[in-house]
Amino acid sequence: MRVKNKKLFRVLGVVLTILVVTSLLGVGLQSIEAAEKERPIVVGSKIDTEGALLGNMIVAFLKAKGFKVVDRVQTGTTKVVREALISGEIDIYPEYTGNGYFFFSGKTDASVWKDFEKGWKTIRDLDKEAHGLVWLRPAPANNTWAIAMRRDDAEKANIKTLEDLASYLKSGGYFKIAASEEFVSSEAALPAFESGYGFTLSNDQIVVLSAGNTALTEKAAAIRQDGVNAAMAYGTDGQLAALNLVVLEDTKHIQPVYAPAPVVRQEVLDRYPEIEPLLEDLFATLDLETLQTLNGKIAVDGEDPKKVAQEYLKSKGFLN
């Protein structure tokens, strides 16, 4: 009888141990899951004006929706911020679809990146497979290389597109552009425009500015520095309207489409799937004119990017 009791006690002891261990494991797993849910979302961005604007929008919007957020806005250059996302140092940042051509050099046809929808879907599929990154739907804007002219000169010569510019140049019209060395020499920039539209600028028609940013090239055109009446620009540059410059339409789609989109690590979306519709609704409101205006408040008027972002979110009903 004692032997049977001993066996019974042993069995009960084993069962009790299993129950205790299972219970502890359950509590442990719940704690891990809870901790995962409590992990903050780290938001980064590039260091430029638009990077600061979009990054601050994402930070403010997610905070307003109750997410814990770590602000790493203006993380660094494209290379720095992308590597931070891939390594998991940050969880979200806004990137441009056209950069997919360089991220996956040699793996796609260049023409893909000149189409808004195809470019987005291509980088979405490539980055998800290669790095577990998810490209949400981009904003309906294109921040690509562009040529801008003084509005008065463009209107006087009836120049609205790069095709118009080509005809104007062939007829001997006056034109002088301020640009960076990269814009002048990169096969993807001025040479691509020249080849695509059938014109060639002489050295006398180009002023290369060493600093190489659009803030300086656009200002040079605005004040006619050294006779300049045109400038290297980006499509969403904030000071274009303020400086009375107009972007000439790239009717042949020579340049890739650089549409800004939130890029999120897959594991973060798995934890917080509601982020996707929230950010896509926000970015759907950011068309070209809107981004130019908002960028202008920062670059021209000197307003704080956080303030500009929050005021815009309030105006659209995203913040109370």
Task: Give, region by region, the residue ranges found by the protein language model.
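Short, polar/charged alpha-helical segment
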Residues: 49-68, 191, 195-197
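Short helix-initiation/N-cap motifs at beta->coil->alpha
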Residues: 49, 71-83, 181, 204-219
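Contiguous mixed-secondary-structure segments that line small-molecule binding/active-site clefts
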Residues: 98-191, 195, 199, 203, ...
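Short, Asp-centered acidic motifs that coordinate Mg2+ and/or phosphate
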Residues: 91-92, 228-230
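Conserved dinucleotide-binding and phosphotransfer motif residues
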Residues: 65, 88, 224
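Short, well-ordered beta-strand elements
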Residues: 37-50, 67-74, 173-179
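Acidic helix-start/capping segments at beta-turn-to-alpha-helix junctions
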Residues: 72-90, 97-102
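Short, low-complexity disordered leader/linker segments with a strong preference
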Residues: 1-40, 320
